[in-house]
Each structure stands twice: as C-alpha cells, then as structure tokens.
Amino acid sequence: MKEKILILNGSFCEIPLIEEAQRLGYYVVTTGNAPDLIGHKYADEYIPADYSNGEAILSLVKENDIRHVISCANDFGVLTAAYVSEKLGLPGHDSFEVAKTLHLKDLFKEYTAKHGIPAPISTVFVNEEDAKEYIKTAKYPIIVKATDLTGGKGILKAENEKEAIYAIENAFSASRSKHIVIEPFITGVQQTFVSFLQNKKVVSYTGCNSYSPINPYLIQAETLPAEGLDEIARPLIAIIENIAEELSLADGVFAFQLIRNGKDFHIIEMMRRPFGNQFLQLVEDNTDFPWHTAQLYAQLGLDGSALPRIPKKRPFCGHHGIMAPRNGTVKHYEIPKEIEKHIYEKVEINPPGSEITNCMNERIAYIFYEYESLEEMNEAVKTFNERITVEMA
C-alpha cells in the first residue's frame, strides 16, 4: 500500500509537486478551502480544510494516516507544515519557531538587524495609534506591510502622512496577527535569488529579474537568470549558509527577494518554499539541478545528496502573467505571433468567459517563454502588457 502524503493546497502552483510525488510512488492527498482549484484534480484524494490552520491540519493528518506533510507555495503552508511536523515528530522541516522567524516579516527583520544582514530597517507596530504617531516624524517615502501575508497583500507605499494613515489602516485590516512593519522605501532593481540547501550548504542557485508594472506589490513577470547574478551570488550564499548553520535549517529551498543597486543590495523578503506561478519549474529548466525531486526528498526526510544532475534546458527563460485592464468578464485575449513563437507553455487560469473581480491580482493566463539572449528577453518582456491585448465585457 502506498504511503500517504499531504500537500497543503492544490492550485496550479502545486501541480509539479503533486505529479513528482506520484512518480515517486506516493499516494497524494491535497487540502485547502478552495475545492475548485485545478491542482486537486491531479491528486489521488482531496480533503477540504484550511491549510493555514495548524490544528485543523494536525487533526486531518492524524485521522487519515498521513505520513508526511509537504508545504505549498504560500508562507502559511510553510508555517503549518513546520507546526504539524514538529507536533508529530515528522522529518523534513524547520522547527516551528525557526519557520516563524523566517516567514513573519517582523521577526525576520529583527533577525536581519541583529545579525547585520543588509535589509531595510523596519519598525514593528501592534496597534494603529502607535503607528500613526510614528509617521508624523517619518522620513518619506515609506512602505507599510502586514507581517504575515504574501502576494502583495497588505502592502502600500506612502509619500506623505495622509497616504501613510491609509496604508497603516490597510495593513492592520489585512493582517491576521494585527502586526505591521514600517520601513524606508528602497529604490532599485527587484530580483530574486533562489538556492537549494543540503546539509546547510548551497548546492544549486540561480536568480531572476522581477517586473511589477501593473501592481507594484505583485510580481507579474520574471526572467532568468538575473542580470549581474555573479556579482551578488557569493555574498548571498555566505548569508544563507550562515543562517542555515545558526538556525540548523532543514534541507530545501531558500530564497531572498531583494532590491539591487549595482553590487549593493537590500533583502526585503525570504522564503523556504516553492514559489507561486510554478517558478521552480523555471529554476529547474535554468539550472542542472532537479529542484522538485530534491524539495520532495527534503520534506520527506530523505537524503537527496546523491540525486543526479539534469540537462540545463533553457539558458534564458521566464514567465509572465496576463492580467485584465479592469474587472469584468474575459471575452478574448490575443498574443502576437512575435511573442507566441517564444512561448513553450501556456496555462489558463481564467479563460474567456471567466469573471475577474480583482484585476490587480488575478491572472488570466501564464505564459512561459525562452529567448536566445538575456538582453533580448528582458527588453521584450517590458513590452508584453502593451502588445498582448485583453478584451473585457
């Protein structure tokens, strides 16, 4: 009989993990409170539950003879997987305290400040009045963030006190824990540096440029590898390996989002999980490392150090989320032939006929593309929103 594993969520982001786990011989159960997500159709079984609720998932695991918990492309999934695994003595995850330190923005910024890691200096607030008093003397622009959300939720930039008041109210309203951080707004090029840890050492890495032309707090497109990757790889690897040693991190993905100014950088977020938008598939195509298999091995508590390297498929690749210009019903979208010829995969999330209720966050489709050079790709991607037409009813 196959061992049961639980993957926390079943969006299209989790499909590669679901398929790889099945290939490895596991019976895959997915969960989450959105039963219509496409990933659930790929699983062997779907059991509804709120994957951000640690106690609910703990009960689900106990009641269904599940042997391992796999985190999803969301920070709440990382926290729940760590919590449940710690309670049941399951391998493959950081301790719950470490997971909170790394994935809650206020705790992570305290950690970076304590250890001299280059990051914006953050001030943490647990009530609105203190935050609103602070902004009276703040140096603008600032950025206000809920500490426990992802995907650009609960984040706003403020140029003045009036905007800051609105940003504070927005962040507190969005945050589950009612914790927010306020920090200086750092300008520069946004990039992601993604690495894989085995025995607390980085064994593979790459990076990407990140583009957010529609919603400045939501990445819409990414191109791999990052421009100037070699200039920042060594210091970032040193930071990651130092954190891994000090916090005794489990094997698996470790990534930073950062703002670059030449060789200087500020770390703004970190993640120990697969990203949304099937980003790990791009990373796998752009390197010679089997990221999905290795991530599953890590969270199953298996030794992945002997996993064979794979051919590097796509030296210059990326993805872009097609977004609607306004809310409404998607009638039609069209990708020009000049872009189409570079696309090797397209995934429709909200096809024609679908209703868009939040055009600043929802995607109509994801396109995955490759080019002959990094320069050509980066220039092309900047024009995608102008050239890809979307008709709404």
For each feature predicted by the language model, list its residue ranges:
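A conserved helix-loop-beta module that forms one wall/lid of the active-site cleft
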Residues: 86-154
